């Protein structure tokens, strides 16, 4: 029973590896989201004896490279809702300043305490995540398009003020 808690940030993560009763197998350390670092963590996990579960908090899109990497390697990966993690942190005995190292320890502890309730990530969620990302991009580009049209209208209104019915190019 080994819980790998990963506190994901933009471009880097903090990793802590715990066994039951708070036994720290690997002190919290930082790693980048590059292939080299992910392979190094994979090698470290392969050397460990016991069932391994990787636990991370959902962070918009930042957790996706790590999630995809370990899911494709066949690991049990669980993505936790940030609200559930916040509630757990509030009820947890780990208090004090909020740091990435403490967060990774808390996430690993969550994995140990909720071991049998953890839900394994399913691959088809990738499709929904990609659709969500594409939807966000579409909305963003539509907002840019509308702003550009509004700006063009303002420029035409200012420059063609003497013409009663301006011919618009759109």
Model regions and ranges:
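Gly/Thr-rich phosphate-binding beta-strand-loop-beta motif of the actin/hexokinase/Hsp70
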Residues: 1-19, 107
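Short, basic/hydrophobic alpha-helical segments
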Residues: 36-53
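Anion (oxyanion) recognition and catalysis
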Residues: 71
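Amphipathic alpha-helical coiled-coil segments
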Residues: 131-148, 152-155
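Single conserved hydrophobic/aromatic residue that forms the stacking wall/gate
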Residues: 161-170
């Amino acid at each position: 029973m080994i819980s790998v808690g990963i506190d994901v940030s933009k471009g880097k993560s903090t990793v802590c590896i715990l066994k039951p009763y708070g036994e720290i197998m690997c002190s919290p350390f930082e790693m980048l989201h590059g292939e080299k670092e992910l392979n190094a963590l994979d090698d470290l996990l392969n050397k460990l004896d016991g069932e391994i579960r990787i636990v991370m908090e959902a962070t918009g899109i930042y957790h996706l490279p790590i999630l995809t990497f370990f899911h494709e390697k066949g690991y049990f990966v669980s993505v936790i809702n940030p609200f559930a993690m916040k509630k757990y942190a509030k009820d947890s005995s780990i208090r004090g300043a909020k740091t990435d190292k403490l967060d990774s320890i808390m996430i690993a502890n969550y994995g140990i305490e909720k071991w049998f309730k953890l839900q394994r990530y399913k691959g088809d969620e990738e499709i929904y995540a990609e659709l969500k990302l594409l939807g966000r991009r579409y909305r963003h580009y539509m907002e840019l398009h509308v702003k550009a049209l509004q700006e063009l209208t303002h420029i035409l209104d200012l420059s063609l003020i003497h013409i009663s019915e301006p011919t618009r190019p759109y």
